[in-house]
Amino acid sequence: MLDLSGIPLYSKDRHSLHNLVVAGGPCTCNAEPFADFVDVAFLGEGEEQMVQFVQLYKEYKANGADKQSFLKAAAQIRGVYVPSLYTVSYHPDGTVEAVTAESGAPLPIQKYIIQDLDTAFYPKDFVVPYIEVVHDRAVEEVFRGCIRGCRFCQAGMIYRPVREKSWETVSKQAKCLCDATGYEEISLSSLSTSDYSQLEPL
């Protein structure tokens, strides 16, 4: 994808603020293997981080700022990891020996966890595909995390703690989704929807 776009693979070769490569989601629970390739990695849950990040980007871009000054400012957002601001040294066996941060860069970097899903940012307008897709319905998240705690499950571990939306919020957002998209079906999304404590009133 980067090659087709004419965007250099390595972060150090991208000098413009227009060519940022940003990563997020479950793969960033171990961000170091792709640290040379991304400019920014969101650690944790990105809905609220992304809003702050985009607002900051717009401000810096409007002022004609350079990439490095923007990245230093972005690193101050909780859960935003900017690999170029850190130096990692390794033991002979390949394990991490030390992580050193540039002046002003936070260490350790704490992942961002949304405390209240009822008040968290939730987009009202979704892109609807113009062709038939496998999951041809709206998707509404009912809770995050999982009460099971299975040791083999990465998602069950990294999305802790368990947080539920109230059934009233789920119902309201589901109605908005149907109105905005034209879908008549909704998927109630979570790691284990049958464990949602408010399933009956919903």
Enumerate the predicted regions with their spans:
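Glycine-rich beta-alpha loop elements in corrinoid/cobalamin-binding modules
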Residues: 1-100
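Generic detector of short, locally flexible boundary/turn motifs and exposed helical patches
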Residues: 5-10, 16, 102-109, 116-118, ...
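Short coil/turn linker and secondary-structure boundary residues
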Residues: 29, 45, 65, 112-115, ...
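Residue-identity detector for glutamine
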Residues: 49-55, 68, 76, 110, ...
